[in-house]
Amino acid sequence: MAVVLDLLNKDTRPKLDAPARPRHPEKAHRPDTAIQRKPDWIRVKAPGSKLWAETKDIVRANNLVTVCEEAGCPNIGECWEKRHATFMIMGDTCTRACSFCNVRTGLPAALDEAEPEKVAEAVAKLGLHHVVVTSVDRDDLKDGGAEHFSRTIAAIRRASPGTTVEILTPDFLRKPGALEVVVAAKPDVFNHNMETVPGKYVTVRPGARYFHSVRLLQRVKELDPTIFTKSGIMVGLGEERNEVVQLMDDLRSAEVDFLTIGQYLQPTRKHHEVVRFVPPDEFKAYETTAYAKGFLLVSATPLTRSSHHAGEDFARLKAARLAKLGPAPVAASIRAVNA
């Protein structure tokens, strides 16, 4: 597979005659694994519409990074055609090296202090009613980037008061007080992905700790029960069904509201192999099980991704909570948090 060049930062864009900087130098020693042909149920239309191009132009004009591009999301054509984009703050270089992820690994640059305003400007230009903001892991920062998340949320609120904000955060491992800073900024949805079952963490997500991530999501609810919490996993990495069901129980013990389950797709030959393409009927079975365990909302399809249909899902989340609790308890919770 061709090395993908960084085309997002005008100041660091490689020259045509310069050697490409490897995205994943830490994976160079790994043996190649064959990339399997995708089954028919995972085919998507290539992007290229006028609205897709307009969204790309706005992203470029504000010198922003999107996880849609960096992670090689298969839904980019559909989402950008709807002028939906998931902004990835704090640069395009991650301090961790998860075996499933296509985001560049290395030593990140200093934070762009103007980035929160740039994101807010792009949100306003795109006319987004709901925006998703994620980030690379920044273990090099004292607070893991918590203050940068907080400033970005605040900037969006100022520029687009009617826009709801969903964040997809790293785990802030060994960053005391970081989570509290982010929650105090009052995002509407707090998403932190578990990514896989605990038995696969050593090979899939080696820099993270499974129960730390569960506790992170639980702590969000303790700090502010009005914030919706969300988490997602990939399947097809060699997990067993009983492991996925146990993960559901762990997330429900943390009062997580929304679960997403999607098929893992291998970015390059150096990444973790796809052990299995899970058929659609098994995703439907996972969805049924998750609803039975009490999640307010479940999205489980081969092409499900954390930010896919996020705006529509937020409306469904609100409706589901209202139907479950009724208007009086919801209003009381909001008053208690704001007191």
Swiss-Prot record:
Pfam families: Radical_SAM. Keywords: 4Fe-4S, Cytoplasm, Iron, Iron-sulfur, Metal-binding, S-adenosyl-L-methionine, Transferase. Its main location: cytoplasm. InterPro entries: Aldolase_TIM (IPR013785), Elp3/MiaA/NifB-like_rSAM (IPR006638), Lipoyl_synth (IPR003698), rSAM (IPR007197). It comes from the Bacteria. GO terms for cellular component: cytoplasm. The keyword Phosphoprotein does not apply. Binds 2 [4Fe-4S] clusters per subunit. One cluster is coordinated with 3 cysteines and an exchangeable S-adenosyl-L-methionine. Residues 13-35 are annotated as: Disordered. It catalyses: [[Fe-S] cluster scaffold protein carrying a second [4Fe-4S](2+) cluster] + N(6)-octanoyl-L-lysyl-[protein] + 2 oxidized [2Fe-2S]-[ferredoxin] + 2 S-adenosyl-L-methionine + 4 H(+) = [[Fe-S] cluster scaffold protein] + N(6)-[(R)-dihydrolipoyl]-L-lysyl-[protein] + 4 Fe(3+) + 2 hydrogen sulfide + 2 5'-deoxyadenosine + 2 L-methionine + 2 reduced [2Fe-2S]-[ferredoxin]. Its EC number is 2.8.1.8. One of its GO terms (molecular function) is metal ion binding. Gene3D superfamilies: Aldolase class I. Pathway: Protein modification; protein lipoylation via endogenous pathway; protein N(6)-(lipoyl)lysine from octanoyl-[acyl-carrier-protein]: step 2/2. Residues 80-296 form the Radical SAM core domain. [4Fe-4S] cluster 1 binds at residues 68, 73, 79, 307. CDD domains: Radical_SAM. [4Fe-4S] cluster 2 binds at residues 94, 98, 101. NCBIfam families: lipA (TIGR00510), PRK05481.1 (NF004019), PRK12928.1 (NF009544). Belongs to the radical SAM superfamily. Lipoyl synthase family. This is Lipoyl synthase. It comes from Methylorubrum extorquens (strain CM4 / NCIMB 13688) (Methylobacterium extorquens).
